[in-house]
Amino acid sequence: MKRRLLLCLFSVALVAGTLYAQEAAFCHPGLLHSEEDFEAVRARLAAGDEHALEALEALRTAPPVNGDHGHNWGVNEYISRGISGQENYMNAYRNAARAYQCAWLWKITGEEGYGDVAIDVLNAYRIYNKGLAGNTNVSLIPGFIGYQFINAAEIMRDYKKWPEEDFELFKQYMIDVWFTTAQDFLERRHDTVEREQNWYHYHSNWGLGNALFCVSLGVLCDLPDIYNYGMYWLKEGPGNESLCVTALHPDAFGQGLCGYGWGLIPWFHKDERGPLGYLNQMQESGRDQGHAMAALGLLSYAFESAYNQGDNAFCNLTNTLIPGQAGAAMVAGAAEYVAAY
C-alpha cells in the first residue's frame, strides 16, 4: 500500500511541476520548532529570565498537563466528528495538546516524567485508534488535530525511552489512519469537485488543515513526496486553500481578481499600512473571528514548518497576475489585514 501511495504522490508532484523538497535529509526537529528554538528557551531559563520562568510555570500548570486531568482522556477506537451523539473528537484534541505540551516540557527541562507522558499518549493512539469517522466533518480531524500529534512526535523522536520500533510504527499509523483521510478530502472533497465541476465548495480552512497535515507528516516521516504533496495544494493547487492565482480563476462580481470563494487570498487592497502598499484579504475574512484567524494560523503553521526545512515559502510567491507589488508579500499582507480584525 505504501508503495502505491508514494507513486501516486510522485505523479501529483510531476503534474504540479515543482518539487519543494529534494531528496536531501530533513532537519529534525524541524516543524513548528527547530533545535535552535529550544536552545534559546533553555538559555533564557538557565539565565533566570523572569518572563521565561513565568511561562514555564504556566506550561507546567496548564490543564492538559495537570489541571483537573492528570491523565489521558479516553482514546477512542474511531475518532468521530459531525454526527450528533457520536462525537468524541474532543478527547483527541485534548490528548494532542497534552502530548505536545509535555513534549515541550521534556525538551526544555530534561525531566523524563513529561517525556513519558507524551510517549504514553502517542503510543496509546497508535495502538488503539483504528480510524477517523463521522460525516463530512471527518475531514477537519487531520488538519485541526493530527498535525498536533505529529508535532509532539517530532519533538520526541530522539527520546531515549521511545524505542525506534515504536516510533516507526507510529509514523506508519499516521500514514495509514490519518493521511488517507487528508488525501481523500484534498482530491475528492466529498465528490463536490465532480458534482459541481469546480474546487470551490469548501472554505479555505478545510484544505489548509489537510495540506498542513501533509506537510507535517512528510517531515516527520522523512518522505519528500508527502511534503511536496502538501505544499502543492498550498502553492499550486486549484482549491480555496491555494495561494495560486491564474487567469483561470473567475472574477466574480468585479470583487478583485478572484472574487469571493476562489483562492486563499482573493482580494488585494491598496493601503499604506500593508507591506508594499497592500493589505491582502483572505477567503475566510468576513466570517466569524475564529474562522478568519484560523486561516492565517493554519497557513503560518505550514509555512513555518517549511521555513525550518530551508523552504522560505513566505517570500517566494510573487505572481505577475496580482496587482502592483502585492504578490511579493502575499502572506505578510494577509497577516497585516488579519491583525486589524
Predicted features and spans:
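Long, repeat-rich segments with strong aromatic
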Residues: 219-341
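Short, contiguous, pocket-lining structural segments
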Residues: 141, 170, 198-209, 218-222, ...
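Bacterial N-terminal signal peptides that target proteins for export
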Residues: 1-8
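Bacterial N-terminal signal peptides
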Residues: 8-17
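Extracellular glycan-targeting catalytic surfaces
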Residues: 22-196, 200, 208, 212, ...
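Basic/polar N-terminal segments that are highly enriched at the extreme N-terminus
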Residues: 1, 18-24
